[in-house]
């Protein structure tokens, strides 16, 4: 069973990659080191909520979607990523 940190991390990575951002770009946008952001994506560290809000704003999605571990959330993440890339 996945931990919440792993679920959030997978969703962060998926959304970032689909949106065309690098880890460095996201980290800079939210004011953390790339290594810290990498730890969030890998599920090693818990993402502070205030940073989740910044990340959700950057990706143009609702923060709660980053906690979802299901197909509906994946579809919403995909839709958000395509809106960003347009």
For each feature predicted by the language model, list its residue ranges.
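A short, Lys/Arg-rich alpha-helix, primarily the initiator
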Residues: 1-18
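Residue-level signal for the short linker/turn that defines the boundary of a DNA-recognition helix
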Residues: 10, 20-21, 47-50
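DNA-binding alpha-helical recognition surfaces that contact promoter or target DNA
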Residues: 10, 14, 28, 39, ...
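Short alpha-helical DNA-recognition segment
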Residues: 20-42, 54
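The DNA-recognition helices of helix-turn-helix-type DNA-binding domains
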Residues: 33, 44, 70-74
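Nucleotide phosphate-binding site architecture
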Residues: 38, 64, 72
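DNA major-groove recognition helix of helix-turn-helix/homeodomain DNA-binding modules
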Residues: 50-65
């Amino acid at each position: 069973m996945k931990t919440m940190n792993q679920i959030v991390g997978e969703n962060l990575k998926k959304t970032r990659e689909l949106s065309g951002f690098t880890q460095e770009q996201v980290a800079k946008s939210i004011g953390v080191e790339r290594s810290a952001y990498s730890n969030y994506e890998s599920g090693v560290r818990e993402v502070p909520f205030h940073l989740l809000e910044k990340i959700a704003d950057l990706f143009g999605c609702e923060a709660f979607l980053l906690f979802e571990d299901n197909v509906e959330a994946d579809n919403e993440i995909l839709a958000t990523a395509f809106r960003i890339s347009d």
